[in-house]
Design a protein with these regions (language model features):
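Flexible, glycine/threonine- and acidic-rich loop/arm segments that mediate assembly and lattice contacts
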Residues: 1-240
Length: 240
C-alpha cells in the first residue's frame, strides 16, 4: 500500500528596476515574493491533501502525477448517504450519495467505529458551516460566564471540544474544505498519529532563464499524503 508524490510549484518574476529601488518595509523583493509564493503553495497543498483526488502515475510530458487525497483513502469507518460508496487506498474516489443533515448521531457512529478499529479519535475537521452545526448539537446550550455587574459577559455560542464516550475530540474548522475539493459535504474524524505529509523534495528554489530585465525563480516541493492506517480515521459524508 502506498501513495504517489505530487509536485506543487510557483514561479515569481522580479524586474531589475523593482529589485533596485527602495522598498518600504522590506530589503529584498525576491525574498518577499518567495514568501508569498510559499504561503500559496501551502494552501494548495492542504486543498489537495484533503480532496477526493485519486493517485495516478501520470504520463511523461503530458499528464502530471497526482497523490491520492484523504477522501480517496478512507474506507473502513465511512458513514454516507444512500447510494454512496467510500474511497479505497487512494486509488478509488469516494462516490457521493443522497445528502442528509449532519447530526450528532452520525458523528457518534463514526467516532465509535474509529475507536473500535483501534484509532484514537482526537480531531473533528469540518468546514465553517458544519462547525456551526456542531456547535448547535443537543446538550450544548447557550451559557454565560458569571461576571460582576460592571463588567461585560461572554456569550458562549461555539463548541471547540466534543466530549465523546471515547475521549475528547477537538473541533477544528477548515476554510479550505469547500466544493472545489469535494470537501463541502464531509467531516473528518482523525487520529493525527496515523497521518502525515511526507516530502520527497522539501521546499526548494530553482533559478530559471532570465527574460529581458526580469529574473525568474521557481519555488517547488514534491510531497504526498502518508496514511499510516486508514482505519484509524473516519469520514462522515453527504452532509448538509
Amino acid at each position: 500500500v502506498g501513495n504517489r508524490t505530487q509536485i506543487s510549484q510557483k514561479t515569481v518574476g522580479i524586474t531589475g528596476t523593482l529589485q533596485a529601488v527602495d522598498k518600504a518595509g522590506r530589503k529584498s523583493e525576491l525574498a518577499y515574493q518567495l514568501s508569498k509564493a510559499s504561503s500559496e503553495i501551502k494552501r494548495d497543498m492542504e486543498h489537495i491533501l484533503l480532496s477526493n483526488q485519486t493517485a495516478s502515475n501520470g504520463t511523461a510530458g503530458s499528464t502530471a502525477r497526482t497523490l491520492g487525497g484523504l477522501q480517496a483513502w478512507l474506507n473502513s469507518n465511512f458513514d454516507g448517504g444512500s447510494g454512496s460508496t467510500a474511497g479505497n487506498l487512494g486509488t478509488t474516489a469516494r462516490v457521493g450519495g443522497t445528502d442528509r443533515t449532519f447530526t450528532e448521531t452520525i458523528l457518534k457512529t463514526v467516532i465509535k467505529e474509529v475507536y473500535e478499529s483501534g484509532g484514537t479519535p482526537k480531531i473533528l475537521m469540518v468546514n465553517p458551516g458544519h462547525k456551526q452545526t456542531v456547535s448547535a448539537f443537543a446538550g450544548i446550550a447557550a451559557q454565560r460566564y458569571m461576571a460582576p455587574s460592571d463588567a461585560p459577559t461572554t456569550i458562549i455560542g461555539a463548541a471547540d471540544i466534543y466530549l465523546s464516550d471515547f475521549g475528547s475530540v477537538s473541533v477544528v474548522p477548515n476554510r479550505f474544505m469547500n466544493a472545489n475539493n469535494d470537501c463541502n459535504d464531509v467531516a473528518f474524524v482523525l487520529d493525527p498519529e496515523y497521518a502525515a505529509v511526507a516530502f520527497l523534495r522539501p521546499f526548494q528554489t530553482n533559478e530559471l532563464a532570465k527574460t529581458g530585465d526580469s529574473e525568474k525563480t521557481q519555488l517547488l516541493c514534491e510531497y504526498t499524503l502518508e496514511v499510516r492506517n486508514q482505519a484509524a480515521h473516519g469520514i462522515c459524508a453527504d452532509l448538509t
